[in-house]
């Protein structure tokens, strides 16, 4: 079964959110909940991915990579989506 981009992103966020070790990072849990809510309410996957990618990049560095593997996997997903979104946004600016 193929999943939509929304479903893939929500599944990846849920996987991180449900990790037992994430309870040690309440600020991260709060952001993950916020971004999953935005997707559920119909916000663009690209826009949410861009914001989440930026947040996760800083968060991962701040915590010296001492976070679960599922968070790194989520970062890979949102990084790809945010690059596509930024590319389309740039086309609109430069054309």
UniProtKB/Swiss-Prot annotation:
UniProt superkingdom: Bacteria
Keywords: Bacteriocin immunity
Entry-linked SUPFAM superfamilies: Bacteriocin immunity protein-like (SSF109797)
Gene3D superfamilies: Ta0600-like
Gene Ontology biological-process entries: bacteriocin immunity
UniProt function note: Imparts immunity to bacteriocin hiracin-JM79 to naturally sensitive host strains.
Name of the featured protein: Hiracin-JM79 immunity factor
Lineage: Bacteria, Bacillati, Bacillota, Bacilli, Lactobacillales
Gene: hiriJM79
């Amino acid at each position: 079964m193929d999943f939509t981009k929304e479903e893939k992103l929500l599944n990846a966020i849920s996987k991180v959110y449900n990790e037992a070790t994430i309870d040690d990072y309440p600020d991260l849990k709060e952001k993950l909940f916020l971004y999953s809510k935005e997707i559920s309410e119909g916000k663009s996957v690209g826009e949410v991915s861009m914001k989440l990618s930026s947040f996760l990049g800083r968060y991962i560095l701040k915590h010296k990579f001492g976070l679960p593997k599922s968070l790194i996997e989520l970062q890979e997903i949102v990084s790809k989506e945010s690059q596509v979104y930024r590319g389309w946004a740039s086309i609109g600016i430069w054309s």
